[in-house]
Regions:
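Class I (Rossmann-like) S-adenosyl-L-methionine-dependent methyltransferase catalytic domain
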Residues: 1-74, 113-173
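A conserved beta-strand element that flanks and buttresses the S-adenosyl-L-methionine
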Residues: 84
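Short catalytic micro-motifs in class I SAM-dependent methyltransferases
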Residues: 87-91
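Short N-terminal helix/helix-N-cap motif within the alpha/beta-hydrolase-1
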Residues: 93-95
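A short glycine-rich, Lys/Arg-flanked "PGG" loop and its adjoining helix->strand segment in the class I
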Residues: 98-110
């Protein structure tokens, strides 16, 4: 699926349900301080908007996003304390994932965190068109490798509900 097809799928066939996740759902709000700026990458219908004080949501498929763009298209001088990548950097090849992570990392402050929900390649959405999506097969090892590659430490890594991987990456100066 190309980006246009992914946008169509996520805007019209997939439904967000943060309540089904323990670590990488609504509980993430408790990890954010009032003065921190959060970039929600692939925010979908921007469900954290209004619940996190300083939040910018980007998503190429949803009008509810603050910016309707991909992570590669998003440009700003602002640097963020935290990024949410909750099911958004899950599509395409190893090289595409690396490129997208690089875009996220370049938008972060030196002392930053990234919270992840990663799909280990499961085509288990409730819509038949899901079978056509090129899911990247995330593993715990990918999180360890990529976090180190980008100067982060993977400080939390575990299975969350619905067969998804929860990870927290931290970078300190």
């Amino acid at each position: 699926m190309n980006q246009e097809q992914l946008n169509e799928y996520f805007a019209h066939k997939w439904k967000s349900n943060l309540s089904q996740y323990f670590y990488c759902g609504w509980n993430l709000i408790d990890n954010i301080c009032d003065d921190e700026w959060v970039l929600d990458v692939g925010c979908g219908p921007n469900l954290f908007k209004g619940k996190i004080k300083n939040l910018i949501g980007i998503d190429p498929a949803y009008d509810e996003a603050d910016y309707k763009v991909t992570i590669e298209e998003f440009k700003t001088e602002q640097k963020f304390d935290v990024a949410f990548c909750l099911g958004s950097l899950n599509f395409g090849s190893h090289d595409k994932i690396i490129s997208e992570i690089s875009c996220v990392v370049n938008l972060l402050k030196p002392d930053a965190r990234i919270y992840w929900r990663s799909n280990p390649g499961r085509k288990d959405h409730r819509h038949k068109d899901c079978k056509q999506i090129d899911f990247f097969p995330w593993t715990f090892e990918h999180h360890k490798e990529f976090s180190k590659q980008f100067g982060f430490e993977c400080v939390d890594l575990r299975w969350d509900s619905n067969h998804r991987i929860y990870a927290e990456w931290c970078r300190t100066t």
